[in-house]
């Protein structure tokens, strides 16, 4: 993500479990990113509801005997809180599929995986990434003016 615009700066890479094995894919992620660097800001996860990814990656790394993948122990940006605030503080209805053009949630992904409908999984991941980036860019373009407006209300 571009720190200036929130837009993508590279191409989407989908690590496909059906082309390899989970342990190999997770190892590739650890090797090809700066996630394990000692410097906390080398890899900053940005997403929506990162708790889901955190729990999954942490548990699967443990199962495979890989280094700890704890995406919430270093700096991260989770836009879920913005969705909750935009829904008036309500968690219900604040999913990415409820506040963007994302057509559905990920409930069908395990089913598609089980029956080998991998094209639908790729389409889903691409749609989710596209809608996340669109939302992120929109927020980046509007939040600076909110900060200026907020500063004008300071009494000190």
Language model region names:
Residues 1-36:
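Conserved RNase H-like, two-metal-ion catalytic cores of nucleic-acid enzymes
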Residues 6-11, 39-156:
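Metal-dependent phosphoesterase core characteristic of DEDDh/y 3'-5' exonuclease domains
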